[in-house]
Amino acid sequence: MSTENTNTAVAEEIPNLLITPSAQEYLHELLAKQNTPGIGVRIFVEHPGTPRAECCMAYSAPEEVVPTDYKQDYPDFPAYIDAPSIPYLLDAVIDYNKDRFGGQLTFRAPNSKVPRVGPDASIEERITYVLQAEINPGLAGHGGNCSLVEVQDDPEHGLTAVLKFGGGCQGCSAIDVTLKQGVETTLKEHILELQRVVDQTDHTQAEGAYFK
């Protein structure tokens, strides 16, 4: 596989997206049915960096190629990656799993929902980034999630992040341990000015929670 990019704005962000051999074979068969010389696939993310992020793939005929797309050449077809989507496709894998019903194309993109933050990002944006990138993937193992409600400048305790736990974390008997040893520690490691982390969630409402 070779790569090519004419967009200097993202020249340092080379995508490492992988299309496995089995997926390449499957896509090659689909593309061959289009009877269009030089046709490839275009890969992009809708609503990147949000909980609604969705990874997409579409046919891309030669005349439809977007000049700023990053081109990956596979043996039987080209793949064009939407330049703004590149950071959200980090470590993404497109695979094809055969089964008795035929098979299924799968798209795993662990960073598609992770928001990006720049050097001038607000503390709210930085906290949300850490929650999405570092904390929620671990909580997801219990069917839980965590989101930022607000940041308060508490006169007594200093800068305080108020969090809301949901899903499997709601009603969890070990929430204090989870908050203190996990979430709070991780947030303070990444955001040095943060002094305290508190939980806004009412854990008495245990219905539908993972832990009871």
Curated annotation (Swiss-Prot):
Q: Which UniProt keywords apply?
A: 4Fe-4S, Iron, Iron-sulfur, Metal-binding
Biological processes annotated in GO: iron-sulfur cluster assembly; protein maturation
Asked if the record carries the keyword Iron-sulfur, the reply is yes
User: HAMAP family, per this entry?
Assistant: Fe_S_biogen_NfuA (MF_01637)
Question: What biological function has been recorded for the protein in this entry?
Answer: Involved in iron-sulfur cluster biogenesis. Binds a 4Fe-4S cluster, can transfer this cluster to apoproteins, and thereby intervenes in the maturation of Fe/S proteins. Could also act as a scaffold/chaperone for damaged Fe/S proteins.
Gene giving rise to this polypeptide: nfuA
Necessary cofactors: [4Fe-4S] cluster
Question: What is this protein's name?
Answer: Fe/S biogenesis protein NfuA
Q: Which residues bind [4Fe-4S] cluster?
A: C169, C172
Q: How does it assemble?
A: Homodimer.
Family assignment from sequence similarity: Belongs to the NfuA family.
This entry's comment on the bound cofactor is:
Binds 1 [4Fe-4S] cluster per subunit. The cluster is presumably bound at the interface of two monomers.
What InterPro entries is this protein classified in? Fe/S_biogenesis_protein_NfuA (IPR017726), FeS_biogenesis (IPR000361), FSCA_dom_sf (IPR034904), HesB-like_dom_sf (IPR035903), NIF_FeS_clus_asmbl_NifU_C (IPR001075)
Q: What Gene3D superfamilies does its record include?
A: Fe-S cluster assembly (FSCA) (3.30.300.130), HesB-like domain (2.60.300.12)
Task: Please provide, alphabetically and separated by semicolons, the GO molecular function terms listed in this UniProt record.
Answer: 4 iron, 4 sulfur cluster binding; iron ion binding
List the lineage, top down.
Bacteria, Pseudomonadati, Pseudomonadota, Gammaproteobacteria, Moraxellales
